[in-house]
């Protein structure tokens, strides 16, 4: 039987930290770092970091929904971010680091809204959930040196996750390391 393919797009701050947790799951066919949500075509990393393009750093995931359904992607996504921070993620500040779920169809939109509501009512966070839910638009792959950063530079990747405060936050709120599911 042929595998199904769907897209999911998530902004979760620095895209380096958003690839590995998804990449290691069954049914995930591809995870690509890039830029989306803005008004500039084919932006560069420097342009996106200038906070003038409207784009956010994001990952676009190609997945088989029969193996790893969208609902599970949402659960894993929430466990990679601080969903209450509207100004960026951890040490990375500005619009390019703001969180968002970019839906590709009405079913994804509904599931994302339900998931956000459920998280807000869970009591895990005292502040309101600030993650945007937006319609997916063009996705521009990031430069090659940003792709699979955790594989190319494992030591720097680990240092960044810890140094940025992301790793400690995730352990505090979810009680396990980022890559344990």
UniProtKB/Swiss-Prot annotation:
Transmembrane segments: none annotated. Its EC number is 1.8.4.11. GO terms for biological process: protein modification process. One of its GO terms (molecular function) is peptide-methionine (S)-S-oxide reductase activity. It catalyses: L-methionyl-[protein] + [thioredoxin]-disulfide + H2O = L-methionyl-(S)-S-oxide-[protein] + [thioredoxin]-dithiol; [thioredoxin]-disulfide + L-methionine + H2O = L-methionine (S)-S-oxide + [thioredoxin]-dithiol. Coiled coil: none annotated. The active site is at residue 14. Gene3D superfamilies: Peptide methionine sulphoxide reductase MsrA (3.30.1060.10). The keyword Glycosyltransferase does not apply. It is an enzyme of class 1 (oxidoreductase). SUPFAM superfamilies: Peptide methionine sulfoxide reductase (SSF55068). The keyword Oxidoreductase applies. Has an important function as a repair enzyme for proteins that have been inactivated by oxidation. Catalyzes the reversible oxidation-reduction of methionine sulfoxide in proteins to methionine. NCBIfam families: msrA. HAMAP family: MsrA. PANTHER family: PEPTIDE METHIONINE SULFOXIDE REDUCTASE (PTHR43774), PEPTIDE METHIONINE SULFOXIDE REDUCTASE MSRA 2 (PTHR43774:SF1). Belongs to the MsrA Met sulfoxide reductase family. This is Peptide methionine sulfoxide reductase MsrA.
């Amino acid at each position: 039987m042929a595998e199904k393919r769907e897209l999911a797009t998530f902004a979760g701050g620095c895209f380096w930290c958003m690839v590995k947790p998804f990449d290691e799951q069954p049914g995930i066919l591809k995870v690509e770092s890039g830029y989306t949500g803005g008004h500039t075509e084919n932006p560069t990393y420097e342009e996106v970091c200038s906070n003038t393009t409207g784009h956010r750093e994001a990952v676009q995931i190609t997945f088989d929904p029969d193996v790893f359904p969208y609902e599970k992607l949402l659960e894993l996504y929430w466990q990679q971010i601080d969903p209450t921070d509207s100004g960026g993620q951890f040490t990375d500040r500005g619009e390019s680091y703001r969180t968002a779920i970019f839906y590709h169809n009405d079913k994804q939109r509904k599931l994302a809204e339900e998931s956000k509501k459920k998280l807000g009512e869970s009591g895990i966070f005292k502040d309101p959930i600030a993650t945007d839910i937006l319609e997916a638009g063009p996705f521009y792959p990031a430069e090659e040196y940003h792709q699979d950063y955790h594989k190319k530079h494992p030591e720097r990747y680990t240092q960044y996750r810890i140094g940025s405060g992301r790793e400690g936050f995730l352990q505090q709120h979810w009680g396990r390391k980022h890559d344990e599911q």
